[in-house]
């Protein structure tokens, strides 16, 4: 009886250290380039390599499990995984987060960049969901300022998605010379719902969406974007987004976090990407996060935008059917894994 009790305490101690002290992740396999890939192994600074595929993401403890799944899915489906360079933006605990990444992906090419939360916090207005108010959710606004000036193009990815196709196809999206970013557009969405009656009733504001636009403004999801960083810097687009955020602090013109300023600046002026690259909304709406089905058509990227995240629903024992597609990319060690180790 005494020995069983000691064994129980030992197992409990393992759980306490591993789960209360932080999540523990498995090491991912190493992935190798196909023979036709150019090599960046000999580049003095892979961070600036023009032969690399550059991916930008945010990294924090709340979404770390999702971020690890994104990384694995990108590498697993890439024909040139050794040519992918990740650029992680983080607001705090960067050393701890770096250790997690290195432990699971020892061969990953990446760099971590600090993000000044204090500089953005005063510009954030409350939205319909608290997760949308996180300062790190606004880091995409500042990528051109945070990342090295040697970078000309980057794919930005949220932490609640997985790829099931080669990211090089997305990275090589054609972007016209007078366009700054590319993303899947959804012109059947009711664009008016993204802004308040105050916005639409003020002609000096609402006319913004009809001035200097290449096409009719349409909704696009900012969780998957191909961004031309040099064009962004040349056009001073960070300042343009900040101006709308400053106005929002004085007059409430939208409700949905970091998305509306992007729409105000870029909608109608983006390069469209095939919808297969953002099967979004799998997290349900922003209030209940109910289960949803895939949109019709082929799929290259699954995106759990909305309130419901697959890892949360799985842990709660209430997964949606499509959450099963996320599970193979989950690197979190189960309690069984921990006991066996």
UniProtKB/Swiss-Prot annotation:
Q: In which pathway does it act?
A: Glycan metabolism; pectin biosynthesis
Give the family from UniProt.
Belongs to the glycosyltransferase 8 family.
The entry lists its GO molecular-function terms as: polygalacturonate 4-alpha-galacturonosyltransferase activity
Naturally occurring in which organism (per UniProt): Arabidopsis thaliana (Mouse-ear cress)
Instruction: Spell out which residues lie on the membrane's Cytoplasmic side.
Output: 1-4
Where does this protein chiefly localize?
Golgi
Q: Which GO terms describe its biological process?
A: cell wall organization; pectin biosynthetic process
Protein name as catalogued: Probable galacturonosyltransferase-like 2
Positions annotated as glycosylated: 190
Question: Where does it live in the cell?
Answer: Golgi apparatus membrane
Q: Which residues form a coiled coil?
A: none
Superkingdom per UniProt? Eukaryota
């Amino acid at each position: 009886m005494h020995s069983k009790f000691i064994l129980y305490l030992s197992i409990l101690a393992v759980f306490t250290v591993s789960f209360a002290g932080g999540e523990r992740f498995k090491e991912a396999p190493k992935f190798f380039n196909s023979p036709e890939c150019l090599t960046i192994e000999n580049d003095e600074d892979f961070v600036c390599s023009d032969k690399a595929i550059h991916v930008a993401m945010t990294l924090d403890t709340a979404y770390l499990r999702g971020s690890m799944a994104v990384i694995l899915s990108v590498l697993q489906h890439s024909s040139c995984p050794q040519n992918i360079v990740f650029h992680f933006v983080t607001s705090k605990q960067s050393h701890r987060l770096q250790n997690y990444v290195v432990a699971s992906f020892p061969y990953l090419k990446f760099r971590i960049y600090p993000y000044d939360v204090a500089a953005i916090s005063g510009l954030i207005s409350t939205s319909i969901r608290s997760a949308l108010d996180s300062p790190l959710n606004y880091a995409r606004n500042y990528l051109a300022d945070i990342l090295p000036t040697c970078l000309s193009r980057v794919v930005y990815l949220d932490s609640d998605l997985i790829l099931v196709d080669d990211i090089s196809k997305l990275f090589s999206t054609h972007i016209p010379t007078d366009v700054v970013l590319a993303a899947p557009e959804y012109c059947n969405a009711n664009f008016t719902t993204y802004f308040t009656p105050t916005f639409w009733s003020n002609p000096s504001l609402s006319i913004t969406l009809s001035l200097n636009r290449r096409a009719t403004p349409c909704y696009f999801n900012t969780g998957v974007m191909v961004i031309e960083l040099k064009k962004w810097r040349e056009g001073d687009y960070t300042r343009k987004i900040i101006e709308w955020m400053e106005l929002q602090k004085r007059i409430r013109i939208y409700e949905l976090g970091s998305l509306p300023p992007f729409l105000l600046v870029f909608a109608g002026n983006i390069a469209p990407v095939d919808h297969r690259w953002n099967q979004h909304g799998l997290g349900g709406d922003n209030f209940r996060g109910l289960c949803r089905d895939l949109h019709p058509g082929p799929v290259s990227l699954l995106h759990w935008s909305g309130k419901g995240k697959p890892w949360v629903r799985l842990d709660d024992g209430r997964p949606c059917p499509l959450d099963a597609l996320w599970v193979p990319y989950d690197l979190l060690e189960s309690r069984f894994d921990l006991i066996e180790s």
